[in-house]
Every structure is written in structure tokens, then in C-alpha cells.
């Protein structure tokens, strides 16, 4: 199968062809997350709060899977661009093996730490029990989830975005169909409550993996997994982790941030914790088109950088930035005009809706400028500069927002936390542009 189209097709249609399947698959995944939350919210607001408290650890596990997958993705794309298929095959094989190892470790460790973790944020035994029930079942499927995301990045690296789209859609549709049956019961199937939501999630992930395995076994691809390729290769493994670890941290930092913000907001009311959890559900949906474009850009940047097509790398960055900013402008408009209805999808509590309406209208002020940070971070990962990408994420999720949120919370109460979001995005955008420009100049003039 020929992969040279990634350096020969015109940039704009190429980026769209790579991004659109990502956007569709992420849209379906986000719709699943929202539908899943809607079903859980029908159990009780306590159930919704339990999911909000579990979110940081669940997000961290996904960060490990996706972040290391970025390392796999970039290395495969770089080697294919340079015409080295043997190293591309070895990258895919080693990447899958390490992903499965990560899954086994997470499957053992995460259930063990959850009771203590949840007890740090609430003394409500019902909330802790719900959170433990949900997380224990979800983490039993971690090995499957790790394999899913490794395959996703492998297919994306070779330009087969449509396969990832079909696999994810199949899993999400299965999940959505199973949610009401397993949560509320149907016929001989008993009502499992929050445990049913977790089980539906795991089954959906298994369906996705089945699709990937079927396509992999029946389709010719530029890269193949091969057991003999698993012989020790410290240099290659080091490259996978050199990109993967910063990418993992990039994605895990929001979990650290949510944990920190939960500790600030819980001092006022559990309603604020619930609002923060709902915001992150909505944020996933609002950011997904821009994130889909960045995901489509990343392997193209890696491939063209490997092929020394530096002018195309610059065009890809500028085009992605413009498209992302336009999309985030639409997200800003939605949050300013229909924040109340958006919140009412997840709760009927008037106090929670009022708090959420204010939060969305303040936080969204930083959406447009955040396009600079997300685009720069994705482009740097594509260039193999994981540490530079990590600097941007540290600014967004630790260095700026944590002290700003703490200071403003002390002066303005919970509203100060919401203001910290947009202030941080403005400051981080300036840093991101300052980090990316020298990197782009360096790779254009080696």
C-alpha cells in the first residue's frame, strides 16, 4: 500500500481527509460520553458526582494509553516518511507490546487505590461506594482499552483514519445501546445501576478491538506487527518513550488539575464539583473538532518532517491553527448563548444549573486563544519534540492555572476558579507561540 500521498497531495484537502474521520469518531465518542452521563444522571445526582470524582484517575489511564500511542504514531510516521519500513514495523510491534504491559499494570493498580482516593474528596459513604463500583469494573477492561488505542495510533500513522472512525463508532454505538439496558434493566437483564454503565463501557471497548483485529487481519498495511521484531532495541524504545512520556504527561495533567480544583471547590459545595465534572464532559464535545484536526495534522507533520518537506510542515501548522480558532469561536458562541440549556441536560437541580451557567460563560472566554496552544503542542509532537510540547501543557495545567485559581478562589470564591481558566489560556498561548516558532525555524534550517 502506497503511503506517499501524505507528502504529495495538496495540504488543505489532505488535512481535511485525515481530520474528518477523526472528528467524526471523536464526535461519536463525545456523544457517547454525554449520553452515558445523561443515563447516569437519571440514577441520581450522587451518581453523577461519583463519576466526576472518578474522572481524574480514569483520565490518567486514558492519558497513558493515548500519550504512549502518540509516541507509536510519530515514530511510525517518521520512519515511513524516511522510507525505513523495517523500523516502522519494529516501532509498531514494540509500541503494542508496551501498551499491553501498561494495561496489565493499570488493571492491577487502579482498583487498589480507588477507595482511598475517593475518600480524600468526600466523607459520603454512598458516593465512595458508587465510585468504587464504577471504577472497579471500568479498570477490568484497561488491557482492552490500551490495545484499542495502540491500534488507533498505528492506523492513523499510515493514513487509515477511516478504520479508526469505524472501530470507534462501532464501540460507541454498542455502548449507547447497552447503557439503558444494563443501567435500568430490560426483560431478564437486571438493573445494575452505575455498575451497568461501567460494564457497557467495557463491552463497547471490546467491540472496538474486534473491529481493529478484523481489519488488521484482512487488509494490507504499510506496517505489520511481528513477534521476531520484539528483540531488545533500547534506542527505539527510548525514542518511543521520549515522545510518549511527555505526551502522557500532557494528557495526564488535566487529571492533576481536576483533582486540585475539586479540592478547592469541595470546600464550598458538592454542586461546584458536579459543575466542574459536567464542564469537562462538555469541553470534550466542544473541543473535539479542533482536536480532531490536530490529530490529523500530527502524523502529516511527522511524515513530511521525515521526508524533509519543511515547507509543507509550516503550511500544515498555519492551516490547522486557523481552522481550530474558527471552530473554537463557535464553541464560545454556544457557551455564551445556551449555557443554561447545556447544563440542564445533566441535572435538574436549579442551584447546579445556575452555577454551571456562570461557569461556562466565564470559562469560554479563553476558547479561541487556546487554539494556539493545542496546535503548537500537536505540531511539536509531530516533530518529535515531546519535551517542548510538555512545556506548553505544564503552563496550561499547572504553572499558571493552579496558583491563579488558588489566589482568585481566596478573593472571589468559586467564581475565581472559573476566571483562572481564560487567564491561563491567554498566558499559555503566548508561551506556546514562543516555544513553537524557534522549533519550526530550527527544523526548516537544519
What are these language model-derived features?
Residues 1-19, 76-143, 189-245, 301-366, ...:
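Short alpha-helical transmembrane segments in multi-pass integral membrane proteins
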Residues 8, 12-31, 35, 57-64, ...:
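Residue-level signal for short hydrophobic patches within transmembrane helices
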Residues 17-36, 137, 171, 204-208, ...:
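Transmembrane helical elements of multi-pass membrane transporters/channels
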Residues 27, 31-49, 118-125, 181-192, ...:
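Helix-terminus/linker motif at the lipid-water interface of multi-pass membrane proteins
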Residues 39-59, 125-130, 194-196, 236-243, ...:
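Interfacial/gating helices of multi-pass transporter permease domains
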Residues 48-108, 145-159, 163-164, 262, ...:
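Small-residue-rich hydrophobic transmembrane alpha-helices
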Residues 60-63, 107, 175-180, 209-213, ...:
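Hydrophobic transmembrane alpha-helices of multi-pass small-molecule transporters
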Residues 69, 73, 138-156, 164-172, ...:
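Short runs within selected transmembrane alpha-helices of multi-pass transporters and secretion channels
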Amino acid at each position: 500500500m502506497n503511503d506517499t500521498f501524505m507528502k504529495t497531495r495538496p495540504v488543505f484537502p489532505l488535512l481535511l481527509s485525515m481530520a474528518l474521520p477523526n472528528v467524526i469518531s471523536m464526535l461519536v465518542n463525545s456523544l457517547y460520553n454525554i449520553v452515558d452521563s445523561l443515563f447516569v444522571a437519571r440514577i441520581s445526582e450522587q451518581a453523577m458526582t461519583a463519576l466526576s470524582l472518578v474522572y481524574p484517575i480514569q483520565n490518567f489511564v486514558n492519558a497513558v494509553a493515548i500519550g504512549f500511542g502518540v509516541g507509536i504514531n510519530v515514530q511510525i510516521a517518521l520512519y515511513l516518511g524516511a522510507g525505513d519500513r523495517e523500523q516502522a514495523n519494529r516501532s509498531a510491534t514494540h509500541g503494542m507490546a508496551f501498551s499491553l504491559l501498561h494495561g496489565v499494570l493499570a488493571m492491577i493498580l487502579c482498583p487498589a487505590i480507588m477507595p482511598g482516593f475517593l475518600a480524600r474528596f468526600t466523607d459520603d459513604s454512598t458516593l465512595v461506594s458508587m465510585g468504587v463500583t464504577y471504577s472497579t469494573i471500568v479498570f477490568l477492561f484497561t488491557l482492552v482499552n490500551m490495545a484499542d488505542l495502540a491500534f488507533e495510533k498505528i492506523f492513523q500513522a499510515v493514513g487509515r483514519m477511516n478504520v479508526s472512525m469505524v472501530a470507534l463508532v462501532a464501540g460507541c454505538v454498542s455502548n449507547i445501546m447497552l447503557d439503558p439496558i444494563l443501567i435500568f434493566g430490560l426483560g431478564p437483564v437486571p438493573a445494575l445501576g452505575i455498575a451497568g454503565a461501567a460494564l457497557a463501557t467495557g463491552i463497547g471497548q471490546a467491540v472496538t478491538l474486534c473491529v481493529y483485529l478484523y481489519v488488521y487481519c484482512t487488509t494490507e498495511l504499510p506496517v505489520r506487527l511481528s513477534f521476531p521484531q520484539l528483540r531488545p532495541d533500547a534506542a527505539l524504545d527510548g525514542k518511543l518513550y521520549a515522545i510518549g512520556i511527555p505526551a502522557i504527561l500532557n494528557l495526564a495533567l488535566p487529571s492533576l488539575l481536576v483533582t486540585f480544583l475539586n479540592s478547592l471547590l469541595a470546600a464550598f459545595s458538592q454542586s461546584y464539583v458536579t459543575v466542574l465534572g459536567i464542564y469537562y464532559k462538555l469541553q470534550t464535545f466542544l473541543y473535539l473538532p479542533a482536536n480532531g484536526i490536530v490529530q490529523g495534522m500530527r502524523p502529516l507533520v511527522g511524515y513530511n518532517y521525515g521526508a524533509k518537506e519543511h515547507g509543507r510542515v509550516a503550511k500544515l501548522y498555519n492551516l490547522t491553527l486557523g481552522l481550530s480558532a474558527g471552530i473554537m469561536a463557535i464553541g464560545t458562541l454556544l457557551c455564551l448563548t445556551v449555557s443554561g440549556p447545556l447544563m440542564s441536560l445533566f441535572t435538574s437541580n436549579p442551584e447546579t444549573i445556575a452555577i454551571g451557567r456562570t461557569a461556562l460563560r466565564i470559562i469560554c472566554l479563553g476558547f479561541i486563544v487556546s487554539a494556539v496552544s493545542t496546535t503548537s503542542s500537536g505540531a511539536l509532537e509531530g516533530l518529535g519534540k515531546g519535551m517542548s510540547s510538555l512545556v506548553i501543557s505544564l503552563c496550561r495545567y499547572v504553572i499558571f492555572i493552579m496558583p491563579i485559581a488558588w489566589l482568585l478562589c481566596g478573593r472571589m470564591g468559586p467564581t475565581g476558579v472559573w476566571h483562572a481558566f481564560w487567564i491561563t489560556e491567554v498566558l499559555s498561548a503566548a508561551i506556546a507561540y514562543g516555544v513553537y516558532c524557534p522549533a519550526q525555524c530550527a527544523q526548516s534550517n537544519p
